[in-house]
């Protein structure tokens, strides 16, 4: 039987009066666009709920949901989130949802981070109850922000670690059961004296041995150092690879337009690094930057990615939340 409002909505008396006059018809389409979460709790057909961990990428469209991918990082809007949830549920992909969108939406005129604007973007989803989708396994986490430590992205003044924890607290005040993730390493998060009571997940992306968090490291040391630091902070850990700028030069193929002096990863690098990261027992997902059809359509790259997919699929699932209790809002 259709109903007018999701259980998370508390309509005001004026709205109730309007419904009494015109009935539910005008509201049904908005309500019915959201899929029903599985009625029996966690669904073991999702990677990480049963066997394996999610394997996926930034930049996938809903039309690309499905094998070989079992996870995706998706930038959504209030008008698109329902259709993304439907698509993910239909293809059994676990979704990390970027609710606020790109950084351009929450910066000051000088390019510095504006926490108030970020919160305003999050407020547009207050009528959406994500908790059933978290329980089912469809929604893996709320992606708070990309690369907070990259000063160039934030007008020369990166968001503070205290601001990141406040972002996580604000998310939890609306959706206590929704895990919070930030795409930066636990090592960066651990600098300073911020305590993370609401942030759940750190994110370590291999960008090669010449720059980024992997500078001077082997993939094995990168894995071990990030796992150790995440454990110290009691954070879950997502790993990823930078396919297009994370090579050591052995591919001979220049990186993206932003970094033509860097290198794409070779097939051998993808297979080796991906296997090292996907097999790490502490890692709860392998979600990489980014989907690029010309890169992935090369036979040797496709074969390398498929070998990593198999590793991610057969290992035991791992939770992304590492604390014993969910912090109070």
Question: In which residue ranges do the predicted regions lie?
Answer:
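Glycan-processing catalytic domains of CAZymes
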Residues: 33-329
């Amino acid at each position: 039987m259709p109903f007018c409002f999701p259980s998370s909505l508390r309509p005001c008396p004026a709205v109730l009066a309007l419904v009494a006059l015109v009935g539910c018809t005008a509201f049904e389409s908005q309500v019915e666009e959201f899929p029903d979460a599985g009625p029996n709790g966690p669904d073991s057909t999702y990677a990480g709920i049963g066997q394996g961990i999610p394997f996926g990428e930034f930049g996938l469209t809903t039309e690309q949901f499905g094998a070989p991918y079992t996870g995706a990082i998706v930038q959504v809007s209030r008008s698109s989130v329902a259709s993304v949830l439907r698509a993910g549920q239909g293809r059994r992909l676990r979704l990390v949802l970027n609710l606020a969108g790109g950084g351009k939406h929450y910066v000051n005129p000088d390019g510095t981070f504006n926490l108030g604007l970020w919160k305003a973007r999050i407020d547009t989803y207050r009528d959406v109850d994500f908790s059933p989708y978290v329980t089912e396994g469809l929604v893996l986490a709320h992606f708070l922000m990309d690369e907070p430590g990259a000063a160039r992205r934030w007008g020369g003044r990166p968001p503070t670690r205290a601001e990141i924890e406040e972002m996580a607290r604000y998310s939890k005040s609306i959706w206590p059961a929704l895990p919070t993730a930030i795409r930066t390493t636990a090592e960066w998060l651990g600098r300073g004296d911020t305590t993370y009571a609401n942030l759940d997940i750190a994110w370590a992306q291999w960008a090669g041995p010449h720059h980024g968090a992997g500078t001077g490291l082997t993939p094995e040391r990168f894995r071990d150092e990030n796992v150790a630091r995440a454990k110290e902070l009691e954070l879950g850990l997502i790993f990823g690879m930078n396919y297009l700028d994370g090579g050591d030069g052995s591919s001979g193929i220049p990186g993206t337009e932003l970094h033509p002096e860097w290198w794409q990863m070779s097939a051998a690098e993808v297979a080796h690094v991906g296997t090292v990261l996907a097999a790490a027992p502490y890692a709860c997902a392998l979600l990489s930057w980014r989907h690029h059809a010309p890169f992935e359509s090369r036979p040797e790259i496709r074969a390398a990615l498929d070998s990593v997919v198999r590793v991610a699929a057969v290992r035991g699932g791992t939770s992304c939340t590492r604390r014993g209790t969910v912090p109070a809002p």
